[in-house]
């Protein structure tokens, strides 16, 4: 076997670290996966131990190589994709984190966001394409600097480094040599100007973050450096970085304007390619960098739903309605409909197009005849309804009418949910042969940088359809259900107020 036959993708997710080896055809050759602990120190707070993230990530990388029956010397490159916005600060001298990582789902900075909203929201939105929300990294960085004893002074002296998870992985992979991020991850911090492609002094001033902690922003596809000697058995080029949702968009080959994908993971994330135009949203969507190749930025509109597949975990762990996540489809299929039950899973507030931090989970339409099967079905449908609202907003903003939706992520294997998604959208929903599109996108980014794949055309030709779900619902029925859904959402909104939250 000649060397450099494969690409290794590191996929650092919210609940697990994974690694996948891909070949030239984009087929998976070996996989490693390990869950890690979620820490919930207070209501609304979510943290990860960054050392555990690193140890599980390097562990699964070795596992994937061994499962593929190859060595590090067989790799052409490594690509990295990561849970976005999750925020970490470490000591440059020791490489030790000064606190647990604050996860994207964490709401501790919501009151701070409210306090600066009137004065700064417009500036932040115009420059970053984001809404002012606790979800993004900037306010988390400020919280760490203000709440970890001595952190701000040490940051001013240049002793500390901030990074999203991609930065932390590259730092550790290179033995502390590189402190970098890519444009997609930088575009999720509230500190980066998506129009100039640089960290922005005005944004840094608003959020009180010193420039000295920031990583260098690089392309999403270029050779950044090599893995440290002794780490994997050979020094491998690290050549691609993309935030998970952007990487999935690339892996789904949504390479032209108006192409869109939806990833059904813990949350749901829909991105539509808008090419070189950073389309400002009038409907509370995000404008974000989709990828940056050779200094050229491609943009996307993004809508995020906080609770997607996580609603199934709640049925399993919170209500014990199912024993394992895989049982939900069979249970939901035992009834023909939810019999009018609507479940709005606003467990941590609502994302796009509402951005309501004070909404809470709500179930309406329950009668004595309601069973766990109706609740299971309502839970699956809730994911599709939330995604339909994102698409509605996207079409309004972009002026592009969607022809099809490409889907991926864990819950996209649920045929019942995908059929309902097509019904409620009124467009075909298409699942590709390789549903690990996040990791595949990272592999593509890395492979392009080292010439393993020659061009984005190569990538577009690799994408293959596995199953197509055609809409089967009448326009009248669709409108009726969407009206009912919006009524249910209205019941869930503004539930907590500041004084109670």
From Swiss-Prot:
Pathway assignment: Polyol metabolism; glycerol degradation via glycerol kinase pathway; sn-glycerol 3-phosphate from glycerol: step 1/1
Chain segments annotated as transmembrane: none
Cross-referenced SUPFAM superfamilies: Actin-like ATPase domain
Gene: glpK
A Pfam family annotated for this UniProt entry: FGGY_C
GO biological process, one term: glycerol-3-phosphate metabolic process
Positions that bind glycerol: 84-85, 135, 244-245
Catalytic activity: glycerol + ATP = sn-glycerol 3-phosphate + ADP + H(+)
GO CC list: cytosol
Family: Belongs to the FGGY kinase family.
EC number of the protein: 2.7.1.30
Protein name per its UniProtKB record: Glycerol kinase
Keyword Transferase in annotation: yes
Positions of ATP binding: 14-16, 266, 309, 313, 410
Task of the protein: Key enzyme in the regulation of glycerol uptake and metabolism. Catalyzes the phosphorylation of glycerol to yield sn-glycerol 3-phosphate.
Organism: Deinococcus radiodurans (strain ATCC 13939 / DSM 20539 / JCM 16871 / CCUG 27074 / LMG 4051 / NBRC 15346 / NCIMB 9279 / VKM B-1422 / R1)
Residues binding ADP, per UniProt: 14, 18, 266, 309, 410, 414
Sample GO molecular function, one term: ATP binding
Activity control, per UniProt: Inhibited by fructose 1,6-bisphosphate (FBP).
Binding positions for sn-glycerol 3-phosphate per the UniProt entry: 14, 84-85, 135, 244
PANTHER family documented for this protein: GLYCEROL KINASE (PTHR10196:SF69), SUGAR KINASE (PTHR10196)
Lineage, top ranks: Bacteria, Thermotogati, Deinococcota, Deinococci, Deinococcales
Assigned keywords, A-Z: ATP-binding, Glycerol metabolism, Kinase, Nucleotide-binding, Transferase
């Amino acid at each position: 076997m000649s060397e450099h036959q494969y690409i290794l993708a590191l996929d650092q997710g919210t609940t697990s670290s994974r690694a996948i080896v891909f070949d030239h055809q984009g087929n998976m050759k070996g996989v490693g996966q390990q869950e890690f602990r979620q820490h919930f120190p207070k209501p609304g707070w979510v943290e990860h131990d960054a050392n555990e993230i690193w140890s599980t990530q390097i562990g699964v990388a070795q596992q994937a190589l061994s499962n593929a029956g190859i060595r590090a010397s067989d790799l052409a490159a490594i690509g990295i994709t990561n849970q976005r916005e999750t925020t970490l600060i470490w000591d440059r001298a020791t490489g030790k984190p000064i606190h647990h990582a604050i996860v994207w789902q964490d709401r501790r900075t919501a009151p701070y966001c409210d306090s600066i909203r009137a004065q700064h929201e417009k500036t932040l939105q115009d420059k970053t394409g984001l809404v002012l929300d606790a979800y993004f990294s900037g306010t988390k960085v400020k919280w760490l600097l203000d709440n970890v004893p001595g952190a701000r002074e040490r940051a001013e002296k240049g002793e500390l480094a901030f990074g999203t998870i991609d930065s932390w992985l590259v730092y550790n992979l290179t033995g502390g040599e590189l402190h970098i991020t890519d444009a997609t991850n930088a575009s999720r911090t509230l500190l980066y100007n998506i129009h100039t492609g640089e960290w922005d002094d005005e944004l840094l001033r608003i959020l009180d973050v010193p420039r000295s902690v920031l990583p260098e922003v690089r392309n999403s596809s270029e050779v950044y450096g090599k893995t440290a000697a002794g780490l994997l058995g050979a020094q491998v080029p690290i050549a691609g970085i993309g935030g998970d949702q952007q990487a999935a968009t690339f892996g789904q080959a949504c390479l032209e304007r108006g192409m869109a994908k939806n990833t059904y993971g813990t949350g749901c994330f829909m991105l539509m390619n808008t090419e070189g135009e950073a389309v400002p949203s009038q409907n509370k969507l995000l404008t974000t960098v989709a990828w940056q190749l050779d200094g050229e930025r491609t943009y996307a509109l993004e809508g995020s739903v906080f609770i997607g597949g996580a609603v199934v975990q709640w049925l399993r762990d919170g209500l014990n309605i199912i024993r394992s996540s895989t049982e939900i489809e069979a249970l939901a299929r035992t009834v023909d409909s939810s019999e009018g039950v609507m479940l709005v899973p606003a467990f941590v507030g609502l994302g796009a197009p509402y951005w309501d931090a004070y909404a809470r989970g709500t179930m309406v339409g329950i009668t004595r005849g309601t069973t766990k099967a109706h609740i299971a079905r309502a839970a699956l449908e809730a994911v599709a309804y939330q995604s339909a609202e994102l698409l509605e907003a996207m079409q309004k903003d972009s002026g592009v009418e969607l022809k099809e939706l490409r889907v991926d992520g864990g819950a996209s294997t649920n045929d019942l949910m995908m059929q309902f998604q097509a019904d409620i959208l009124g467009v075909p929903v298409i699942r590709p042969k390789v549903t690990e599109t996040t990791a595949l996108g990272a592999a593509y980014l890395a492979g392009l940088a080292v010439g393993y794949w020659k061009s984005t055309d190569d990538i577009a030709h690799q994408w293959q359809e596995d199953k197509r779900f055609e809409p089967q619902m009448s326009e009248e029925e669709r409108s009726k259900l969407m009206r009912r859904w919006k009524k249910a959402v209205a019941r869930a909104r503004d539930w907590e107020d500041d004084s109670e939250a």
